[in-house]
Amino acid sequence: KKNNSFSGLSLVIGLSLGHGIKHFGQGALTVIGPLLKASLSLSEVSYALIFSSMNVSSGLSNIPAGILSDMYRRKIAWLLAISMFTISFGYLLIGLTKIYILILVGVILIGFGTSFWHAPAFGTLAARYPQKKGFALSMHLTGAQIGNTLGPPIIGGLISGITLGSFIKFSGFGWETVSMLLVVPMILTGVLVLVFFKSAGIESDSNWSFQEYWERTKTLIEDKIILGLIILGAMRASIHTSFQLWLAVYLKEELDYSAWIIGWHIALITAAGIISTPIMGILSDKFGRKPVIQISMSLMAIYLFLFLIFDEGIGLVILIGLLGMFFFSVMPIVTAATMDRVPKGSEGSGTALNFIGMSLIGFMSPVISGIIYAKYNFEGISIFAGVIAVSGILLCTFLPMKKVN
């Protein structure tokens, strides 16, 4: 059938590229963050509140994104463009101000725009490729991982500067200038989405009224297995947010690395996932979601606890790379497991609920992990993230994961 065919992969590839550019900008904040923290002389808790605010905004944006994605399926391109334009305004504001409240407004815009992409994009892919959800969603996340991998070292190089022999000597820009430069690719991507993805959403037979949308959403919320999958996704997001946020600060404040070196370390978190993510998606389509999630989270837990031993040098680098094989890659598998239970036509809402859970259930993790980091340093973060991973393994073990739609 046309919807299940991979002869027409243009939508998957195009949305994956757009997702990659979005994450290129999103990952920039991880490198800019420690410099912003030092520039504004922020405490660990004040710094963590910036990312908590972003998570709350990110979670709340899924509500209108889910509603609009299911009610206006043929306007998907506009929803994706709005996502990119909102992110661009956030980075513009961060680059223009040193006032803490306005910085919060900037990251709130970035968080809102970042998650506003997910419901229309994931929902459209799940509807377009119903028998290959794992692969389609994993390919979309591969685009994100390419952006996450390229973003930090490029942003770090733009800030720190790069010297290669006597031929290339670039002294770098200030982090404020780099923040404003990010406006250009975000706006350009939004415009290109409007031009090239007018067909996104054509697989939908009709648009839902708000009443129909609400009735369908209530059935999703009342499904205990879907709620369990949302919590599982939130636990993974909490691990990712806590670890990546404080790894960057640890590399800057404890190991005294430059922004460029920090960028390369952060890039390792997602580099290996570029290869592992589509493979895991194919395996989950063939053998089921549960074994792929269980194995991935088990290895994540082991690697996280090993940071207690290997906290610098080559050991740290290898561990980050190994963790990167599963850190982000398991997310599309959890999302695909949720999509397996979502009725046709509600893919946008199912995606939105997943990301609302990731953002809102995990929104306290930056603050909690900030308190832990202030008292126990990076060792405390490793234990905190490792315990959440073990809890996720237990939850996954008891959650039924079977296609019902």
What is the meaning of each model-derived region?
Residues 29-30, 224-274:
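Extracytoplasmic gate region of multi-pass secondary transporters
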Residues 36-37, 68-69, 154-163, 167-168, ...:
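Interfacial helix-cap and linker-helix signal at transmembrane-aqueous boundaries
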Residues 60-98, 284-290:
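Conserved MFS/SLC helix-loop-helix module at the cytosolic interface between two early adjacent transmembrane helices
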Residues 106-144:
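Cytoplasmic helix-loop-helix junction between adjacent transmembrane helices
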Residues 148, 344-378:
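A late C-terminal transmembrane helix in Major Facilitator Superfamily
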Residues 284, 289-337:
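C-terminal transmembrane helical hairpin of 12-TM major facilitator-type secondary transporters
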